[in-house]
């Protein structure tokens, strides 16, 4: 935990030791080398710089950051945005914008450019799919999601999918004079930031953190009348894995003229079938589908049964940032084994949930598989996802330091992964009295541990958690 705090507080000891990290938060070595090359070539030493892929994303970043940010197209479709290093607030705003909307250049594209400019001898050897990977991935996803292949768009990251979907819905509903947005439940950090930062002055954002009271949610939606634009939720929610009568919410949103956006990333489209309830599905494919956790990619799917299908499909397509070709090729290889791996994750997660639920060291446990509503959306019996969240009776820090699994902010990998979720996603909330009070109000424990259960032999997984729990109490 000392290293987690050190990362959040940017301690030189920790930052120097980190060779890599989640790509939207930690700049990959290949991207860093590419930045150094471009900065020297363009004579921009002493400037704060980021890379953005695609003209659509470029325009959005420039619109958001305003004056003071300049741009150079350093390679075809690749843009170097830069600002005064002394303007700390603008430099931070620029970095955060690229993080939120997921539009950066990632490692495979950076590697290709390093090779192009003779800065790297060759490509890292890896197995990829042959043939038309884009079509193959879209075909498989369409089968899982329940739509046509043409209704699925691949994006450069999961956040790019969320942002592109948001912009598409926003364009549709602004044209209809609808301005009221509603967030149901807790949203992932950057998803929430997109809603807060990119709505216009004439648009509003309200929150309903308790997704269990569907009657109250429907009455709230009714009050917006003809102004309801969209309702956004993760289903199941992250990190508490909450589910509800989503079909009732969907019916109400449609009755009131809104658009329902659902993100099923925490369980994946391989486990849950939510498109029948949504107008728009947005999801990360970095989780579950890329079981090695080594591909940045997302997907958007428009429900053919939505009354807004034609216009929404056009709006989303106009706003999306496509996935990079080599990322798709790698994903095309991994997606072939993903269903088998994901089924094993679900099976192991169910067994670990049963073990943790009766362990005296666990105070509270959250698991989608224990919900009475999951069966209505599960792809098949036992499709529960890999994620479990727990509150501990004992010392969280002792447990975290002792548990011998990989630690990091992602999930849905073939290897078990664990993180102190609120410390990594909302460090500002867990380190202030005001923040902790807010978390208590919405029912999230600051010391919550989120576990993504992998495909290792179950007995080995249980033994690791048993040892760490015994130490913590």
Model-derived features: positions:
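Short, conserved charged micro-motifs
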Residues: 88, 394-401, 458-463
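Conserved PLP-enzyme active-site core in the AAT-like
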Residues: 144, 148-361, 366
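Short amphipathic alpha-helices in soluble, non-transmembrane regions
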Residues: 311-312, 398-406, 464-469
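Active-site-adjacent capping/gating segments
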Residues: 373-380, 422-446
């Amino acid at each position: 935990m000392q290293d987690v705090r050190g990362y959040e507080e940017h301690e030189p000891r920790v930052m120097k030791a980190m060779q890599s990290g989640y790509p939207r938060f930690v700049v990959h070595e290949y991207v860093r080398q590419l930045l150094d090359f471009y900065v020297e070539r363009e004579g921009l030493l002493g400037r704060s710089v980021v890379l953005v892929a695609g003209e659509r994303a470029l325009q959005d970043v420039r619109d958001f950051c305003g004056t003071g940010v300049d741009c150079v197209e350093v390679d075809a479709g690749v843009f170097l945005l830069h600002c005064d290093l002394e303007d700390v607030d603008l430099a931070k705003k620029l970095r955060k914008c690229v993080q939120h909307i997921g539009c950066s250049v990632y490692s495979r594209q950076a590697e290709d450019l390093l090779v192009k400019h003779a800065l790297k001898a060759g490509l890292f050897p890896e197995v990829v799919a042959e043939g038309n990977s884009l079509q193959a991935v879209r075909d498989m996803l369409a089968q899982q999601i329940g739509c046509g292949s043409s209704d699925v768009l691949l994006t450069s990251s999961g956040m790019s999918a969320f942002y592109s979907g948001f912009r598409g819905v926003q364009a549709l509903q602004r044209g209809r004079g609808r301005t009221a947005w509603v967030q149901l439940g807790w949203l992932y950090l950057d998803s929430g930031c997109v809603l807060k930062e990119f709505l216009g002055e004439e648009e509003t954002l309200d929150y309903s953190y308790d997704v269990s009271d569907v009657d109250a949610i429907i009455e709230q939606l009714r009050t917006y009348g003809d102004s309801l634009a969209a309702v956004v939720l993760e289903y199941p929610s992250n990190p508490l894995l909450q589910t509800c009568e989503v079909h009732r919410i969907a019916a109400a949103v449609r009755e009131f003229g809104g658009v329902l956006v659902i993100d099923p990333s925490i369980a994946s489209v391989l486990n849950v079938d939510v498109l029948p309830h949504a107008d728009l599905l947005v999801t990360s494919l970095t989780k579950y589908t890329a079981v090695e956790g080594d591909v940045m990619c997302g997907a958007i799917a428009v429900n053919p049964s939505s009354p807004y299908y034609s216009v929404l499909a056009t709006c989303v397509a106009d706003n999306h940032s496509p996935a990079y070709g080599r990322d798709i090729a790698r994903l095309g290889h991994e997606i072939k084994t993903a269903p088998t791996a994901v089924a094993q994750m679900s099976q192991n997660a169910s067994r670990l949930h049963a073990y943790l639920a009766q362990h005296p060291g666990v105070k509270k446990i959250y698991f989608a598989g224990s919900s009475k509503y999951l069966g209505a959306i599960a792809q098949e019996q036992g499709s529960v996802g890999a994620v479990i969240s727990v509150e501990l009776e004992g010392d969280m820090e002792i447990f975290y330091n002792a548990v011998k699994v990989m630690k990091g902010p992602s999930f849905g990998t073939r290897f078990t992964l664990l993180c102190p979720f609120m410390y990594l996603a909302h460090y500002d909330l867990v380190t202030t009295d005001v923040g902790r009070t807010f978390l208590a109000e919405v029912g999230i424990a600051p010391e919550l541990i989120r576990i993504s259960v992998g495909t290792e032999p179950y007995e080995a997984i249980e033994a690791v958690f048993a040892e760490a729990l015994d130490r913590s109490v």
